[in-house]
């Protein structure tokens, strides 16, 4: 899956990755080789929790953007939340289980996928509410906070550590970071006024320069986000408020 962020100002794409799990090398001692291949990888998630996984084969993602990141890391999912299809239109196999909406995850559906690794969001309370249940069942679960490209890099780094494909971290992380730096250098210094709108099935909200990927990209390019410090836009969005602000560009995701 490829997604453009802010097409008018930044021509970079999160490129899809093909990633494979660790496999054991042939040896006379098959048991020992299998143990090496299944060695635990331990990392710290964005809640400060230590999480250990061993080549997970059945991954469930609790928000669509993390489904995307896991797929972009070359992983596969056995279960994913509804917005993986509804909002992101990800091309998932027919046998992937829909585990419910982001704010209303279905625990029964999640468990029916028989997950050996679950990925959730720090910023989504419905994800956090399930953490204790996952832990009590002995299912490894990690929570990430991805609101900017650096956060994406951090998560990608962990995902490629899990799969052992650090070449893909360079190709789809560090190389993209360089593309961003090159794009920033090309900014003409005109500092256009912009409005960034994020849409969902039930709402449209104006987003500022911080706490979201697109807002940070626009800020890096020298754009002035009219939602920054503008309560009429950020808290009570209306067509009248947009027309009054009169931005040069409007970006919608």
Where are these regions (language model features)?
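Solvent-exposed loop/turn segments at secondary-structure junctions
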Residues: 65-68, 83-86, 117-126, 146-151, ...
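Extracytoplasmic substrate-binding proteins
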Residues: 49-50, 129-203, 224-228
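Bacterial N-terminal signal peptides
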Residues: 11-20
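A short, structured surface patch at a secondary-structure boundary
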Residues: 63-113, 117-123
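Bacterial Sec-exported substrate-binding components of ABC uptake systems
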Residues: 2-8, 22-65, 166-197, 246
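Alpha-helical, coiled-coil/dimerization segments enriched in small aliphatic residues
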Residues: 84-89, 206-235
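Short helix-initiation/N-cap motifs at beta->coil->alpha
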Residues: 45-47, 96-107, 230-239
């Amino acid at each position: 899956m490829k997604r453009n962020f802010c097409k008018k100002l930044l021509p970079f794409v999160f490129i899809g990755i093909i990633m494979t799990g660790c496999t054991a090398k042939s040896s006379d001692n098959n048991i020992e080789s299998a143990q090496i291949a299944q060695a635990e990888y331990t990392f710290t998630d964005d809640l400060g929790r230590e999480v250990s996984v061993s080549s997970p084969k059945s991954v469930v993602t609790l928000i669509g953007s993390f489904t995307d990141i896991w797929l972009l890391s070359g992983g596969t999912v056995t279960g994913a939340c509804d917005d993986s299809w509804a909002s992101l239109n990800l091309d998932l196999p027919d046998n992937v289980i829909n585990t419910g909406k982001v704010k209303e995850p279905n625990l029964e559906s999640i468990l029916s996928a028989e997950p050996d690794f679950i990925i959730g969001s720090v910023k989504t309370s419905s994800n956090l509410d399930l953490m204790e249940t996952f832990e009590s069942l002995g299912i490894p679960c990690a929570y990430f906070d991805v609101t900017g490209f650096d956060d994406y890099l951090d998560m990608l780094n962990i995902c490629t550590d899990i799969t052992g494909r650090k070449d893909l971290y360079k190709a789809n992380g560090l190389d993209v970071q360089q593309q961003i730096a090159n794009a920033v250098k090309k900014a003409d210094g005109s500092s256009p006024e912009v409005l960034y709108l994020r849409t969902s099935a039930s709402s449209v909200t104006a987003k500022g320069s911080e706490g979201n990927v697109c807002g940070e990209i626009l800020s890096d390019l020298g754009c002035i986000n009219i939602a920054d410090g503008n309560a009429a836009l950020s808290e009570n969005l209306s067509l009248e408020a947009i027309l009054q602000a009169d931005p040069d560009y409007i970006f919608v995701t």
